Amino acid sequence: MSYTLPSLPYAYDALEPHFDKQTMEIHHTKHHQTYVNNANAALESLPEFANLPVEELITKLDQLPADKKTVLRNNAGGHANHSLFWKGLKKGTTLQGDLKAAIERDFGSVDNFKAEFEKAAASRFGSGWAWLVLKGDKLAVVSTANQDSPLMGEAISGASGFPILGLDVWEHAYYLKFQNRRPDYIKEFWNVVNWDEAAARFAAKK
């Protein structure tokens, strides 16, 4: 089984004016495609791992040969992270129900959660991701470097938990529109969070 670039469930301009068409198209067709290509190339000599869903593969990095571990950490990680990211974007959804209640329970308020998430995203030095994760029965905000995922576990990524939503803070995710203004990009994210997808992921794991 080879990994393939997932189709987006919307047009490249669907998130305008918050996320711009040019960035979305380049991000999807160039950056994400490269992660897919590199992961597939690394897996050609690893048939015992090649059939695993990418979300499972990245939980087994410590089982990989040493010469494949880093390339798959980076590229299978990039494929997994971006596949989640695209599905997590949509205009016009509302945070409600069980997920909203859990956020209020674990952060005190939705505003407190947003402030903590924004801080994690803004303070991630260099490239990486900010995440809302479910750890046991509690929600938490974590961040990871590069294309690391909380699914990789604390020993590898410095974080753990099941991702409910994630935000890419690599410069390629925002530089064409926002240049060096990462905090502005982070603020715009709240206008395009697919809370329905986040709620479904939460419901599947709670």
From Swiss-Prot:
The keyword Metal-binding applies. It is an enzyme of class 1 (oxidoreductase). GO terms for molecular function: metal ion binding; superoxide dismutase activity. Mn(2+) binds at H27, H82, D168, H172. Binds 1 Mn(2+) ion per subunit. Keywords: Manganese, Metal-binding, Oxidoreductase. The keyword DNA-binding does not apply. It catalyses: 2 superoxide + 2 H(+) = H2O2 + O2. One of its GO terms (cellular component) is cytoplasm. Its EC number is 1.15.1.1. Its cofactor is Mn(2+). Homodimer. Destroys superoxide anion radicals which are normally produced within the cells and which are toxic to biological systems. PANTHER family: 37S RIBOSOMAL PROTEIN S26, MITOCHONDRIAL, SMALL RIBOSOMAL SUBUNIT PROTEIN MS42. Belongs to the iron/manganese superoxide dismutase family. This is Superoxide dismutase [Mn]. It comes from Escherichia coli O157:H7. The lineage of its organism: Bacteria, Pseudomonadati, Pseudomonadota, Gammaproteobacteria, Enterobacterales.
